[in-house]
């Protein structure tokens, strides 16, 4: 934790140990049982206060390109940095969102079943885009059907009356 602060961090969420004395934590350190879930919850709270459309993008390939095209085309939009598209990167990006942005565009990657569900539940997109279902990521997902199932997890977390954009064929 001290290394993080010496490298410029201003706040830390750490895994609390049973024998940890909460009074000895620094004021800018939060000890929790599950740091990933705590980070996700903070991101959800931030996004609940955002009034613009939230766009979630996943797929075997084309995620970053699609994100970049949308970001270039939507004035004053926010998008995930580079490909910070996992359970740590996406919530961190959400916490950097300026509530004055016109739209928020999030890229979501997956290495295993449940990854897209976890990420899309954080952002609860108004628009969900699946760019492509292909043979990439087969190592963790076993088959093309596995890739389809994982990428389709996005659909279940699109807001009511939201829009899903999926490939044809």
PLM feature spans:
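Phosphate-binding loop of NTP-binding sites
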Residues: 31, 37-164, 168
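N-terminal leader/targeting and accessory segments in enzymes
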Residues: 1-41
């Amino acid at each position: 934790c001290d290394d993080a602060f010496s490298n410029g961090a201003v706040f830390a969420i750490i895994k609390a140990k049973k024998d940890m004395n909460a009074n000895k934590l620094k004021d800018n350190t939060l000890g929790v049982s599950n740091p990933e879930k705590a980070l996700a919850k903070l991101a959800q709270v931030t996004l609940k206060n955002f009034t613009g459309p939230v766009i979630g993008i996943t797929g075997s390939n084309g995620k970053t390109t699609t994100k970049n095209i949308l970001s270039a085309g939507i004035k004053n939009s926010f998008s995930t940095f580079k490909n910070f598209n996992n359970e740590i990167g996406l919530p961190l990006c959400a916490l950097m969102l300026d509530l004055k942005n016109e739209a928020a565009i999030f890229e979501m990657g997956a290495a295993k079943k449940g990854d897209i569900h976890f990420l899309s539940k954080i952002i609860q997109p108004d628009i969900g885009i699946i760019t492509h279902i292909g043979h990439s990521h087969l190592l963790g997902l076993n088959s093309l059907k596995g890739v389809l199932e994982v990428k389709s997890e996005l659909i279940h977390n699109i807001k009511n009356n939201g829009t899903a954009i999926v490939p044809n064929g």
